[in-house]
Amino acid sequence: MEMQSRVLVTGAAGFIGFHLASRLLERGCQVTGIDNMNDYYDVDLKEERLKRLTEHERFRFERMDIADADALKNLFEKDDPEIVINLAAQAGVRYSITNPDSYIRSNIIGFYNVLECCRHSKEKGRKGIRHLVFASSSSVYGANKKVPYSVQDPVDHPVSLYAATKKSDELMAYAYSRLYGIPTTGLRFFTVYGPMGRPDMAYFGFADKMVRGETIQIFNYGDMYRDFTYIDDVVAGVESVAKRPPEEDEDGVKYKVYNIGNHRPESLMYFVETLEKCLMKAGVISEPARKEFLPMQPGDVYRTYADVTELERDFGFSPDMPLEEGMQRFADWYAEYVRRK
């Protein structure tokens, strides 16, 4: 990405948003971050991320919900971003089953507002955006039987509302790109983990329970597989993609979708055993956790597995962090995190 590029990162106090904004600031970009700072998980962790970002003189933050159309419009007019990276979303598959309203508000209405602001970004003499990058999710593949998951595969049968909203985002983004010429790229992330992560994610929640000596719940009796992808690999992928807006396809549309995943699924049981070993090495726990084995939960899928052929072809990049090394990095950070709490 060019030095001094003006980049808007939505969801900047979130897990991926924080790490991405940090990387862009290191590259010399001018970064505006927005976040609604909701309490879906520990706000203190979001505040800590934000505190680190605001130490950079080229970072500016506004507390804002992308569902607030007027506030977002004013921000675009004031900052005139060149690149927009939309990471703001209501996350979580299981939470969407009992709290659908927040997913429609953030993931549908909020993303529509982002698209509208991009559509009108060249008005009033502004340069306008040259690339919109947005977070989709591996959850759009639903219960697809074919693996690895390719961006060419049909994704018409979501098994959660969260997945349905992410697929809806892809459809809306394509329509806006086709109608208004907005260069747009969607990124399907696969089970992102790492330091300063989301407490609602399994690895973080398991670590919390292990520290408290509580029993951890293993769904589908441990017979599940996830394509665990380390945060630095995800950030590197987003950065690579953001630098290069898509070329026109045969229909004249500047729109692409890529998987960003480690393309090496690991079993849930191996993941838990690895987490235990890393936490013991970091001095966080002294013995393995007690485990309760349960059936598959609604909204869950048996396996995720990324085909990153298109990412490798177009950018010469694919994630490669081994789970063992990435999880140790998380455990070492978590040890400090626990001591501070």
Which role fits each region the language model picked out?
Residues 208-341:
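C-terminal substrate-binding subdomain of Rossmann-fold SDR/epimerase-dehydratase oxidoreductases
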